[in-house]
């Protein structure tokens, strides 16, 4: 798919998109059939989030095929070429708010409280269950509005999607945080990343309401896309990795403490710098002039530098924890215990 896009071979791109869609459909069907038996539990709603995400990946892959044909096929029908921007917006909605959003939203229902080292809110499953059909229906409405060129319909659909995400994921996380707030870098990154995604979604809804057509929406939302990626999705990934990596490496409590200690180095400064830089970048995005350009550049340098530090610390933390794990396994006490 990617190779076809880079080489302008639209047949290869469509083939790749078809394969991706078919695999996603297969995966979704497997989850659906398994969830009725082996995965049936109190948390089965999380699996339903993943099934819905797989559905929207199929939709996004299908739309990607049409967009590719509109872009690269000289013999594409006129109606398809004219619908390119509308289909692109619908494709983005299915991919970001559907596939990525539903996957991360469902995961955060359980991962968020776990990273905060507290219990899930007693009503978390109820909130997530109530929000899912609202999320899916509103996203279908938003996508339909995009395809038909009705930006107001897209705006309303997006706003309801944001509300559903806030209800199903945000409210339970906040209620859990009120019991025991985030105290570690991973938990803070997860919470702030989720907050930025909701902000970006609300911004997209506003831009859609103001836009005259899909082309105008694409242009107006360009300033928000880096924020969605760097401040939203990026922080979610970093937060998940920061919490999960020490757990996966293991080695016992002492080894885990070594890894966590490295990952927590300068955590408040990194978190503050990243999010203040994101706020600054968003605030000056609509301004013009040399000063605004310099502020924007400085903000992005700081923001990206925090991720560079994250990468370095993840590497150092993994190495340090692995060494502590090996040292613990080869200590005389451990060896003696094994012989006994």
Residue ranges of each PLM-predicted region?
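Hydrophobic alpha-helical transmembrane segments of multi-pass integral membrane proteins
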Residues: 1-340
